[in-house]
Curated annotation (Swiss-Prot):
Pathway per the UniProt entry: Amino-acid biosynthesis; L-arginine biosynthesis; L-arginine from L-ornithine and carbamoyl phosphate: step 3/3
Enzyme class: lyase
Organism annotation: Burkholderia lata (strain ATCC 17760 / DSM 23089 / LMG 22485 / NCIMB 9086 / R18194 / 383)
Family: Belongs to the lyase 1 family. Argininosuccinate lyase subfamily.
InterPro entries: Arg_succ_lyase_C, Argininosuccinate_lyase, Fumarase/histidase_N, Fumarate_lyase_CS, Fumarate_lyase_fam, Fumarate_lyase_N, L-Aspartase-like
Pfam hit, one: ASL_C2
Molecular function via GO: argininosuccinate lyase activity
Name the record gives this protein: Argininosuccinate lyase
Subcellular localization(s) per the UniProt record: Cytoplasm
Length: 469
């Protein structure tokens, strides 16, 4: 009997009295985006075939033919010679049809005890597991680049901001280490997400399992899964792992976006804290002087794109009854694009950070503005017995006086300072000016997590050790 798969193109066409319309074929086909799953689809099929042979469900000869045919198909795909067909819907049926054309009936036996429902769920998990590992490596590369730049700038002083107003002096190295912490949490989330990705759905079949004596644990071991999905209904319909990964990716991009905003600000000529290498910037078609930080700007924009993919996946799943529904075909494009966007962004940012030129003089000049050591003066008074709230009020008055005169606290003479702060004049000595220097301010924050240069160097060392584990 002629196979329906080859007579009409669809694996299920014997049930229907008329062929699918061309419009519906285009509307329902996924092959031109899910073909990126081809190699993991082959890996999953080979593991399934080996299990079928071990369980005496197919013969050793069938297995040998399947392995031979899959090797040829894999080569065709890798060389770009495989002919993908819209009529065959998706990556799975394209490969199965080619296998059957190469080896005959043995190819038709491969799908025994399996549905495309558990097959695609397995493929996505296999593929995503590898991509999570790749993204983990890229996060490590970016953290390494940030640590190098932080170490080089452990003593470089810049203004720290709250509300985008000058707050207190910090070191540039300390500032960069904040992003190392963010990306470290991202790496932890990716590793944690991987544990839930790494469960095998294969064996759930369409939704209820299969009557064949399969060995799911053997397949899981072959494919490197930590275990199997425990419920067949959940196994084929679950996309939590894709949502969780996309949520973790949205956080990665949020951290990249925050960093991008600062890079754009720091590179502005009105700030001038850094310069980004030319190879990461573009010019203007009309303004000859322009050097635009397009990479961080685009990263900000692409963050919204990944956030949108997260909402798309959440919305995709919210109304689905058990078990598998065709809606789930729409999981792939958001997931694929999220992976591509995050991976490309992390790779380019690691390279860009390594090429940043720091301008310490501009940073220092900015830190000298805005009364960044006012808190240090308040702390000075507290250490001499004044309650903090009283010290805060006294220094706030001194700041207002200096602001009216257009000078900084450190520009006052000792006599002027005592004159402006008569209620605490007896507490103020010549040593006060050591507290009002930028170097004195940052050096005084000499505790774990503080901005003192020694703490920055210690934090860099600890972070490098953690990266190496």
């Amino acid at each position: 009997m002629t196979s329906q798969l080859h007579k009409k193109g669809e694996a299920w066409s014997a049930r229907f009295s008329e062929p699918m319309s061309e419009l519906v074929k285009r509307y329902t086909s996924s092959v031109f985006f899910d073909k990126r799953l081809a190699l993991v689809d082959i890996a999953g099929s080979l593991a399934h075939a080996n299990m079928l042979a071990a369980q005496k469900i197919i013969s050793a000869d069938d297995l040998a033919a399947i392995e031979r045919g899959m090797a040829q198909i894999k080569g065709e795909i890798e060389r770009g010679e495989f002919e993908w067909q819209l009529d065959l819907e998706d990556v799975h049926l394209n490969i199965e049809a080619r296998l059957t054309a190469l080896i005959g009936d043995a190819g038709k036996r491969l799908h025994t005890g399996r549905s495309r429902n558990d097959q695609v769920a397995t493929d996505i998990r296999l593929w995503l597991r590898g991509e999570i590992d790749r993204i983990g490596g890229l996060l490590n590369d970016l953290r390494g680049a940030l640590l190098d730049l932080a170490e080089q700038n452990a003593d470089t002083i810049m203004p720290g901001f709250t509300h985008l107003q000058v707050a207190q002096p910090v070191t540039f190295g300390h500032h960069l280490l904040a992003y190392v912490e963010m990306f470290s949490r991202d790496a932890e989330r990716m590793r944690d997400c991987r544990t839930r990705v790494n469960r095998l759905p294969l064996g759930a079949a369409a939704l209820a399992g299969t009557s064949y004596p399969i060995d799911r644990h053997a397949v899981a071991k072959t494919l490197g899964f930590d275990g199997i999905c425990a419920n067949s209904l959940d196994a084929v319909s679950d996309r939590d792992f894709a949502i969780e990964f996309t949520a973790a990716s949205a956080l990665v991009m949020t951290h990249v976006s925050r960093f991008s905003e600062e890079l754009v600000l720091w590179m502005s000529p009105r700030v001038g804290f850094i310069d980004i290498a030319d190879r990461f910037c573009t010019g203007s078609s009309i303004m000859p002087q322009k050097k635009n930080p397009d990479v961080p700007e685009l990263a900000r924009g692409k963050t919204g794109r990944v956030n949108g993919h997260l909402m798309a996946l959440l919305t995709l799943m919210k109304g689905q009854p058990l078990a598998y529904n065709k809606d789930n075909q729409e999981d792939k494009e958001p997931l694929f694009d999220t992976v591509d966007t995050v991976a490309d962004t992390l790779r380019i940012f690691a390279e860009m950070v390594a090429g940043i030129t720091v301008k310490p003089d501009a940073m220092r000049a900015a830190a000298l503005q805005g009364f960044s050591t006012a808190t240090d003066l308040a702390d000075y008074l507290v250490k001499r017995g004044l309650p903090f709230r009283d010290a805060h009020e006294a220094v706030a008055h001194a700041v207002k006086v200096c602001d009216d005169r257009g000078i900084d606290l450190a520009d006052l003479t000792l006599d002027e300072m005592k004159q402006e702060l008569p209620n605490v004049a007896h507490l103020i000595g010549e040593d006060v000016f050591g507290y009002l220097t930028l170097e004195g301010s940052v050096a005084s924050r000499n505790h774990p997590g503080g901005t003192a240069p020694d703490q920055v160097r210690a934090a860099v060392k600890a972070a490098r050790a953690a990266l190496g584990q």
